[in-house]
């Protein structure tokens, strides 16, 4: 519910051309509907909300938006609802000036498959920004319908900043996903920092190479915010204590197994479970240290 409320509020705040849907009660009703269904329903309702605001600008804008949204839906509906969260969060991250947090978070939580939904989210945000910036021309009667469509088409296809951002998002998602799934210690933290640095470097040098106007301070602050948010996600989602890592091995009739066990940070050492694997009987015996301690105290008493 909260995510849907934020999404619909941000869309109304960014566009807000149709007064009938630019209303807190409409946002609340749509948010309640989304609370009962999957994230895909929220995505479809958000697209319909965008389409309604575009219709208030002009029929040409609404038609162009409908074609663009259908193409995006064909892409992102092929993925799971968890991956499609990236499509919803990307426009929000731009309005909050922390776009780097989306590819970093998607890379550690969902993997490389979320690169496509996040890229679609980038295109969706820049299209809404285009409609907002060119609303005066698009609403004017002196501009021909074909000129309006050409304006929208050029604003999407020739937007170098948008395509640079799409490439950066895809690169960061893939890099973070690969590093975070490695077996070495602190893989998530290294992936988060690496992803933020890659975002900053590609955005800065890409902007210089493509002559795109960007704010250096905003890019750096977005990268720093991505690191902070990534560490928070790592603490709640992974939360392991690498200082207590244990390496062990066991074998059966066919294989020798080398196991690296990293305990959760919130699990105290006295409550951990020790599993002993027997190769002959292939029986797993679980011995809990706290129960052994209690048995010893009972016998002593």
What are these regions, as identified by a protein language model?
Residues 32, 45-118:
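Membrane-interface helix-loop-helix junctions at boundaries between adjacent transmembrane segments
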Residues 1-47, 53-54, 63:
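Hydrophobic transmembrane alpha-helices
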Residues 92-224:
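Generic multipass alpha-helical transmembrane bundles of integral membrane proteins
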Residues 239-291:
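Short, highly charged, low-complexity non-transmembrane loops/tails of multi-pass membrane proteins
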Residues 16-25, 39-43, 59-65, 82-86, ...:
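Short, aromatic-rich membrane-interface segments at the entry and exit
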Residues 290-301:
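Short, charged juxtamembrane terminal tails flanking transmembrane helices
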Residues 135, 181-185, 212-216, 232-251:
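Juxtamembrane/interface segments at transmembrane-helix termini
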Residues 1-5, 9-13, 35, 39, ...:
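Transmembrane alpha-helical segments of multi-pass membrane transport proteins and ion-pumping complexes
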């Amino acid at each position: 519910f909260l995510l849907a409320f934020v999404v619909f509020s941000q869309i109304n705040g960014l566009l807000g051309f149709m007064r009938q849907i630019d209303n807190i009660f409409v946002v609340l009703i749509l948010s309640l509907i989304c609370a009962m269904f999957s994230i895909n329903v929220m995505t479809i309702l958000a697209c319909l909300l965008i389409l309604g605001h575009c219709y208030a600008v002009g029929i040409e804008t609404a038609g162009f938006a409908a074609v663009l949204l259908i193409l995006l839906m064909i892409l992102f509906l092929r993925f799971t609802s968890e991956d499609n969260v990236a499509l919803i969060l990307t426009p929000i991250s731009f309005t909050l000036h922390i776009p780097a947090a989306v590819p970093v978070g998607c890379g550690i939580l969902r993997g490389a498959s979320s690169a496509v939904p996040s890229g679609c989210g980038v295109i969706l945000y820049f299209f809404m920004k285009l409609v907002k910036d060119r609303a005066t021309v698009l609403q004017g009667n002196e501009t021909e319908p074909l000129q309006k469509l050409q304006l929208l088409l050029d604003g999407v296809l020739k937007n170098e900043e948008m395509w640079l951002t799409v490439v950066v998002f895809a690169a960061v998602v893939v890099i973070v996903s690969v590093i975070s799934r490695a077996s070495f210690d602190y893989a998530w933290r290294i992936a988060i920092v690496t992803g933020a640095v890659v975002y900053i470097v590609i955005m800065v040098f890409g902007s210089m190479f493509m002559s795109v106007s960007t704010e250096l301070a905003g890019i750096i602050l977005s990268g720093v915010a991505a690191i902070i948010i990534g560490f928070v996600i790592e603490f709640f989602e992974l939360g392991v204590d690498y200082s207590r890592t244990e390496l062990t091995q066991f074998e059966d009739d066919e294989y020798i197994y080398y196991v690296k066990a990293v305990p959760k940070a919130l699990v105290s050492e006295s409550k951990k479970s020790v599993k002993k694997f027997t190769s002959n009987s292939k029986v797993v015996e679980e011995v809990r240290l706290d129960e052994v301690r209690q048995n010893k105290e009972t016998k002593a008493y």
